[in-house]
């Protein structure tokens, strides 16, 4: 933070902000201008400067995790070896994560062949993973803010390692599913915490480039990973176990450096007086003024009270209700086919009813009772964030609907070898996404704007979805598959980088982890809906289409549960193989249509997205750099007009929502 911000009168406790969402904008503007050390603005200018009021209120309650990461640039210059060590440590984490993402999807196909229940297990795992990926991120983000980034890294590494141990040793489909679900928490955490730290350390003008660099290992590793998975899957009966198990060893080794170096930064910052008891600088000054620097051991009652307060700040009740409601609403799409009377089964109906009721309980809790809600009010008044959610929720919904069974469809519908199938389906898509993401990042660095690029990407993605739909009924050539993947990656890279940078630019540093996690929460839940839609269509139609072929019931069951056996059991271009291909093609048609229709909604939202100028600040709101120091005054902010519109929208939203 700046020296001016430190010298201002004692700030209010952050809880008062949460209890007063209707605070007068002019008063907020006065406080914000004072915080910036500038009182020369007239009344009109101060009202327009209310953008800083939200930022100021966020800094008032700035949590220890944010202050800790800001201390890096306050203690060490940007060219310091410690800073470069942080970058190198982040690279180790991203390489491990990229290799995981480049291989484990292929292992799952062969694991379910060994354990059975391919179609049902695939759909349930995809749905539950998407739900857990979403609801775990706000929890992990709160760990980042309340404690520290390194604490969050340690926690997710534990989940990641334990999950892969369970998966590698699984002897039943249930054990495999449990392991994958535990692993998903770790994977979601690595992705989230890395995104948060990258945004912590990079100015807006470089945010797109640095974010893309975390995905740069995907340029190389998918090709290497495909060789690894092909060798393991074809070289030994249960090679997939080795594929999963190696990450239980790699993860602790790769994540340890970033944890240790951030702990070292903490220690240096405390010695320099930037931190005290892992608290914010404001808390340190108050402790010195009040003479309470001496540490005293808490009583058992105090410890219990601290635990209760921690649970409130985590909003564990809200996260539990959210996870339970969406699980009950989405899982039936994957299991209804095996239920007696299917949709009319009392258990299926009860799941939908209970899911809807619990979702209502979640909303009531968040609006009326939660002291630290998952849906932070300051974030949800943010027009940029709401548009970003709209774009990404339908982006992931259509994308997951298309991708959940696309690998199985291409495996059966083409004559590609296992290695070439992996190259086209997995390696090409992820490599292209990384390359185009890096190019999009440099576009943002050069032009300092993102909206034109984002809209172009959304249009390209619509074309890609149309090409996926075209690739059926004999049109599924290698060229069609490749170009579908390339165009989808190009459009996705341009869209995602715009959404991420815009949403992060629209909030002060204190809200950074919250907005990243909340964007991930709702977009991943959109992905869960997409996976559930695909699972419902797949499990509801493929068995019927296979029954219309000349396969015996036993052959139908084997083809449905383990598509990998089709390549070896039914030679290419034989009558039975052609019938099977046709059954898979008919099943995918409605899935592709859903994905194509959903691709238009993000385009409409993208047209309404503001176009922030990306400069040297950490965000476009409060004029601070990555160390928390104010480097840009309110009147010099090139995004002042956008911020004024956001304030006007937020004020109207507060009145309309009655929060």
From Swiss-Prot:
BP term (GO), one: transmembrane transport
Q: Which UniProt keywords apply?
A: Glycoprotein, Membrane, Transmembrane, Transmembrane helix, Virulence
Q: Does the keyword section mention Transmembrane helix? A: yes
GO MF term (any one): transmembrane transporter activity
Keyword Glycoprotein assigned: yes
TM regions (residue ranges): 79-99, 121-141, 150-170, 208-228, 245-265, 316-336, 348-368, 379-399, 424-444, 451-471, 478-498, 528-548, 590-610
Q: Where is the composition biased (Basic and acidic residues)?
A: 42-54
Which purpose does this protein serve, as stated in its record?
Siderophore transporter; part of the gene cluster that mediates the biosynthesis of siderophore ferrichrome A which is contributing to organismal virulence.
Name this protein carries in UniProt: Siderophore transporter fer7
- Organism equals Mycosarcoma maydis
Q: What is the lineage of its organism?
A: Eukaryota, Fungi, Dikarya, Basidiomycota, Ustilaginomycotina
């Amino acid at each position: 933070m700046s020296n001016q911000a430190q010298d201002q009168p004692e700030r209010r406790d952050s809880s008062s902000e949460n209890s007063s969402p209707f605070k007068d904008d002019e008063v907020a503007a006065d406080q914000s201008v004072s915080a910036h050390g500038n009182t020369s603005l007239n009344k009109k200018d101060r009202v327009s400067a209310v953008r800083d009021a939200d930022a100021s209120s966020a800094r008032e309650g700035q949590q220890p995790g944010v202050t800790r990461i800001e201390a890096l640039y306050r203690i060490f210059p940007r060219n310091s070896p410690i800073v470069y060590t942080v970058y190198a440590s982040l690279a180790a984490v991203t390489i491990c994560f990229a290799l995981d993402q480049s291989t484990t999807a292929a292992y799952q196909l062969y694991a379910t062949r060994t354990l059975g229940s391919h179609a049902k297990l695939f759909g349930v795992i995809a749905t539950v993973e998407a739900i857990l990926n979403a609801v775990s991120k706000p929890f992990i983000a709160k760990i980042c803010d309340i404690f520290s980034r390194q604490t969050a890294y340690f926690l997710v590494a534990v989940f990641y390692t334990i999950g892969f141990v369970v998966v590698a040793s699984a002897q039943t489909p249930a054990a495999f599913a449990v392991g994958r679900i535990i692993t998903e928490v770790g994977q979601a955490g690595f992705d989230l915490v890395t995104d948060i730290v990258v945004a912590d350390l990079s100015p807006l003008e470089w945010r797109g480039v640095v974010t893309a660099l975390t995905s740069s290992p995907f340029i190389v590793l998918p090709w290497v990973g495909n060789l690894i998975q092909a060798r393991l899957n074809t070289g030994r009966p249960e090679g997939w176990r080795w594929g999963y198990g190696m990450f239980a060893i790699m993860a602790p080794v790769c994540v340890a450096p970033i944890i240790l170096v951030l702990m070292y930064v903490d220690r240096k910052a405390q010695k320099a007086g930037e931190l005290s008891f892992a608290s914010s600088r404001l808390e340190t000054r108050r402790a010195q003024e009040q003479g309470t620097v001496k540490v005293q051991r808490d009583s058992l009652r105090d410890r219990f009270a601290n635990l209760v307060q921690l649970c409130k700040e985590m909003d564990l009740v809200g996260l539990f209700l959210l996870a339970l409601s969406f699980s009950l609403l989405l899982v039936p799409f994957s299991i209804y086919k095996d239920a007696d009377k299917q949709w009319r089964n009392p258990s299926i109906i009860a799941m939908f009813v209970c899911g809807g009721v619990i979702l209502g309980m979640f909303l009531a809790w968040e609006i009326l009772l939660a002291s630290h809600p998952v849906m932070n009010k300051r974030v949800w008044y943010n027009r940029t964030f709401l548009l970003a959610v709209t774009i990404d929720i339908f982006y992931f919904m259509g994308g997951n609907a298309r991708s959940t069974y696309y690998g199985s469809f291409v495996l059966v519908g083409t004559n590609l070898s296992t290695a070439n199938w992996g190259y086209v389906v997995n390696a090409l898509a992820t490599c292209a996404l990384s390359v185009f993401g890096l190019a999009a990042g440099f576009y943002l660095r050069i032009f300092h704007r993102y909206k034109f690029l984002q809209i172009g990407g959304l249009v390209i993605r619509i074309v890609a979805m149309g090409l996926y739909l075209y690739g059926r009924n004999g049109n599924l050539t290698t060229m069609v598959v490749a170009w579908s993947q390339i165009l989808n990656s190009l459009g996705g890279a341009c869209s995602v980088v715009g959404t991420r940078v815009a949403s992060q630019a629209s909030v002060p540093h204190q809200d950074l982890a919250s907005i990243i996690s909340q964007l991930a929460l709702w977009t991943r839940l959109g992905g869960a809906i997409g996976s559930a839609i695909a699972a419902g269509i797949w499990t509801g139609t493929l068995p019927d289409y296979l029954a219309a072929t000349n396969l015996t019931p036993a052959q139908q069951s084997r083809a449905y549960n383990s598509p990998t056996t089709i390549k070896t059991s039914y030679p290419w271009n034989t009558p039975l193989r052609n019938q099977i291909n046709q059954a898979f093609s008919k099943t995918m048609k409605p899935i592709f249509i859903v994905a194509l229709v959903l691709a238009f909604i993000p385009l409409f939202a993208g047209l309404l997205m503001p176009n922030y100028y990306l400069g040297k600040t950490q965000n476009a709101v409060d004029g601070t750099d990555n160390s928390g120091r104010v480097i840009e005054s309110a009147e010099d902010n090139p995004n002042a007009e956008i911020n004024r519109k956001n304030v006007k929208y937020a004020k109207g939203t507060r009145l309309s929502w009655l929060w």
